[in-house]
Amino acid sequence: MTTLAIDIGGTKLAAALIDNNLRISQRRELPTPASKTPDALREALKALVEPLRAEARQVAIASTGIIQEGMLLALNPHNLGGLLHFPLVQTLETIAGLPTLAVNDAQAAAWAEYHALPDDIRDMVFITVSTGVGGGVVCDGKLLTGKGGLAGHLGHTLADPHGPVCGCGRVGCVEAIASGRGMAAAARDDLAGCDAKTLFIRAGEGHQQARHLVSQSAQVIARMIADVKAITDCQCVVIGGSVGLAEGYLEQVRAFLMQEPEPYHVALSAARYRHDAGLLGAALLAQGDTL
């Protein structure tokens, strides 16, 4: 059965047709509407899926935020703008005229990456470091979503009790420091106003402050992974996201993790499906994989 998979992120929307063998075809992308209003997102989704819907039999959505009963919610409302309580499933069912499933994008990506691992891996954690920091947890071969959809929101664990205020309302969350947005917010002087991509470029050029911001992000993520290992005793951690997959970043995270006591060490790897993980994981779930 062909699935129309959609990935809704903070900066871009992606859609593709995915068959039962996880082959991706007709992949399309559009920028996420800058206004982040319900009408703008609805029109963008319509434009994105219209050329694809005739060949699909169902829709699977991987979206930023928390999905509760088909509605879009968020720990950090700033990530959604005016889209809080957006009726995601109902909107796509109306646009596509097809049965629709929606799941958090990091949870979906975790499920895809889990399927790419050897059969003897039953416990894994996926972490995405991008505009925000998210995650997904697979325990004994089952994806944890939680009754309220909150499971895996690792970016809202504590990194620094004296750190910046996070958009979720807590002080010193991992996301507020280690995410692309957090790094950009901390940039000063000649780096003020730079986005994360620019910070990585400047770090590669040897800019001291940029190198510090990237290193600080990697250290915060490494410490979070040590916490995750203590909580889940996972067999491996897979890292994705635009920051997580940036050149040299995973190596820095690995080096910082090795500074933690040995019981907190865990195998790290880059996401195999990279930026398609959310699409593939949502399709897998829609095609019959159970949570």
Curated annotation (Swiss-Prot):
Keywords, in A-Z order: ATP-binding, Carbohydrate metabolism, Kinase, Metal-binding, Nucleotide-binding, Transferase, Zinc
GO MF entries: ATP binding; N-acylmannosamine kinase activity; zinc ion binding
Source organism per UniProt: Salmonella typhi
Name of the protein described by the UniProt record: N-acetylmannosamine kinase
Pathway: Amino-sugar metabolism; N-acetylneuraminate degradation; D-fructose 6-phosphate from N-acetylneuraminate: step 2/5
Family, as annotated: Belongs to the ROK (NagC/XylR) family. NanK subfamily.
Function: Catalyzes the phosphorylation of N-acetylmannosamine (ManNAc) to ManNAc-6-P.
GO biological-process terms attached to the record: N-acetylneuraminate catabolic process
Pfam family, one: ROK
Source species taxonomy: Bacteria, Pseudomonadati, Pseudomonadota, Gammaproteobacteria, Enterobacterales
Sequence positions that bind ATP: 5-12, 132-139
Entries under SUPFAM superfamilies matching the protein: Actin-like ATPase domain (SSF53067)
Enzyme Commission number(s) of this protein: 2.7.1.60
Catalytic activity as recorded in UniProt: an N-acyl-D-mannosamine + ATP = an N-acyl-D-mannosamine 6-phosphate + ADP + H(+)
Assembly description: Homodimer.
